Amino acid sequence: MALVYLPDMRLNADLRGDVSAPPVVLIHALGTNSGLWADMPLPPNLRVLSMDLRGHGASDAPPPPYQMGAMIRDVERLMDHFNLRDAVVVGISLGGLIAQGLAIKRLDLVRGMVLSNTAAKIGTAELWNARCDEISRTGLQPYATGAMERMLGRAWRDHPKMPMLRQMLVQTALDGWIGAARAIAGTDFFTPTAALRLPTLAIAGANDGTTPPDLVRETADLIPGAEFHLMRGVGHLPMLDNPVAYGALISAFLARIGHG
C-alpha cells in the first residue's frame, strides 16, 4: 500500500490488477482498516482498490467530527485519482453507508453495490453520540471488549481472528474513530437509497449484533431487484468468520452481473 497525497490529506490505498480489468472497490468498517479484506478470495481478473478511510490505519486522522459527505468524497477522489469508473463497490458497515452515498452522488463511478452488514441508517444519533462521549473520556481499550462480542458473537474470546481485530480497533486513532462515528450518527440514507436503480447484493450475518439481518433486509428492500443473502454462523464481519464463503458470494454476484 502507498499514501495518496490529496490536497488536504493523505490516504493509504492499494490498487491491484490489470488496468483494463473490471474495478472493485473495498470499503472497510468503523475501527478497522484495509487489512480486514486480507483473507477474502476474489477472482484474479479484477482491478481491486482498497484503502484506509480517513482516521483509520495509515491514513491521516483530522480532528473530529467528520461529515459522511467528506468520507464519501475521499473515496470519490481516490477513484478519480486512479481513473476508476463503473466499479462494483463493496462496503461493510460504515463502508456500506459510504457505498450508498457514493452511488447516490456519482452513479458514473458505481455500476453495482455489495452492501454487507450495513443499512441505510445504523443506530441512532443519541446512541452514537453517547458512545463518542464515553470513548473520548476512556479511550478505545475499554470499549473493545463489548465491540468484540457485537462483531464476533458470544464465542469471541475463542475466535482465531479476535487478536487481530482487537489490535486494529485499539490502534485506530481516537480522533478517527470518534470522527467517523459522528458521521454515522448524522446519516440517514433511507430516501436517497430508495431512488437507486443498480445491481445490489445485500449480505447479513445471522449472528450480527450490530446490524441485525432484519435491518440489512430492510435496506435491500429499498432497492428494486436487490438480492439478499443471510450467512449462517457469522457475525458482523463475515470476511473474518468465513472468508471463503463470503468471497464466493461476492464472486458469484460479480459473475451474474457480468463484472469480470
Question: Where do the language-model regions lie?
Answer:
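Conserved alpha/beta-hydrolase "acid-adjacent" motif
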Residues: 209-215
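Conserved HGGG/HGGXW glycine-rich cap/lid loop of the alpha/beta-hydrolase fold
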Residues: 9-61
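Catalytic histidine-centered segment of alpha/beta-hydrolase-like enzymes
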Residues: 234-247
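Conserved acidic catalytic loop of the alpha/beta-hydrolase fold
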Residues: 70-87
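Conserved alpha/beta-hydrolase catalytic His-Asp/Glu region
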Residues: 11, 123-126, 138-194
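Catalytic histidine neighborhood in serine/cysteine hydrolases
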Residues: 217-236
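Flexible "cap/lid" loop of the alpha/beta hydrolase fold
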Residues: 97-105, 109-144
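Short beta-strand/loop motif that positions the catalytic acidic residue
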Residues: 196, 202-204, 208
